[in-house]
Amino acid sequence: MDENKKRALSVALSQIEKQFGKGSVMRMGDRVIEAVEAIPTGSLMLDLALGIGGLPKGRVVEIYGPESSGKTTLTLQAIAQCQKKGGTAAFIDAEHALDPIYAGKLGVNVDDLLLSQPDTGEQALEIADMLVRSGSIDIMVIDSVAALTPKAEIEGEMGDQLPGLQARLMSQALRKLTGNIKRSNTLVIFINQLRMKIGIMMPGQSPETTTGGNALKFYASVRLDIRRIGAIKKGDEIIGNQTKIKVVKNKLAPPFKQVVTEILYGEGISREGELIEMGVEAKLVEKAGAWYSYGGERIGQGKDNARGYLRENPHLAAKLEADLREKFEPTELSREEGDEDTLEDAM
């Protein structure tokens, strides 16, 4: 860059800093690049699939799927993980359907959980914005986008046609929220429902769509599609669901990874079940017939017994988890190492 351009840029930068504050504009090289903080989901498989060890702080996340697929369970487990690390959690219950007893079973400290059950969509999003701007919330869940009913719709008559009202509300709210979410380093999770598109469909196009317009699709850094794909039985009794979670969008790591995990009724995502599945895949857990062994020690006949053994021996489960993390977690290069590799590749 020639000297005249450098001087003009320097004047412009100093003027911007004077008007908008220090750090309003900066060179990327001047800024220390830090790893994105993440809150674990309670599912080791999903944490590894997300590529950063969980859901990213300072970002918007959308979790969607059919009814009873495990959307709220997943968010409550993330809240429990956050609280274990001393974080503060808030739950905006627009559906007025949160079960505190179930939340407690999943490990949520219900006494410390901030709960709001707003009357309108505007009220819900205004409360969310105020809590985010306080800078004291680590994770916030909004359940759900479909239940964020605009005030005009609530005050109107049944059958009134108000097209695009909720989509406009979401678009306006996200424009306002996103900057505050980044500044306060809060993880904000929107739970969303699926609807069927009405009209002519293109070949190969999915008839499913999420509610609340397209704004959330663009603003979300991570989008998860969660679906029940089967039942888990103990004899004739159904004790849980086999669930597939697909990372549909990920701005922080490669997307389109998917995991199949187990959600047990009254317990949530089966940590021990995941450890066994991943252990067998990584050849850390041996499976001979119906027997499972780890470290030369038999841990159970049948998956249910092996799961119970790991639950009764948490030190063994912790050791297996540490071994799996060592095997599956990507190693991070320092910036200098990364630069050297890039130079070598270029040569």
Curated annotation (Swiss-Prot):
Q: What does this protein do?
A: Can catalyze the hydrolysis of ATP in the presence of single-stranded DNA, the ATP-dependent uptake of single-stranded DNA by duplex DNA, and the ATP-dependent hybridization of homologous single-stranded DNAs. It interacts with LexA causing its activation and leading to its autocatalytic cleavage.
Q: List the molecular function annotations (GO) for this entry.
A: ATP binding; ATP hydrolysis activity; ATP-dependent DNA damage sensor activity; damaged DNA binding; single-stranded DNA binding
User: Which annotated residues bind ATP?
Assistant: 65-72
Q: Which organism is it from?
A: Xylella fastidiosa (strain M12)
- Gene responsible for this protein: recA
For whether the record's keyword set contains S-adenosyl-L-methionine, the answer is: no
A GO cellular component entry from the record: cytosol
Task: Give the family, as the similarity comment puts it.
Answer: Belongs to the RecA family.
Q: Which PANTHER family match?
A: MITOCHONDRIAL DNA REPAIR PROTEIN RECA HOMOLOG-RELATED, RECA
| The protein, known as | Protein RecA
Quote the subcellular location field of this record: Cytoplasm
Its Gene Ontology biological processes? DNA recombination; DNA repair; SOS response
Q: What is the lineage of its organism?
A: Bacteria, Pseudomonadati, Pseudomonadota, Gammaproteobacteria, Lysobacterales
Q: Which Pfam families match?
A: RecA (PF00154), RecA_C (PF21096)
Basic and acidic residues composition bias: residue spans: 327-336
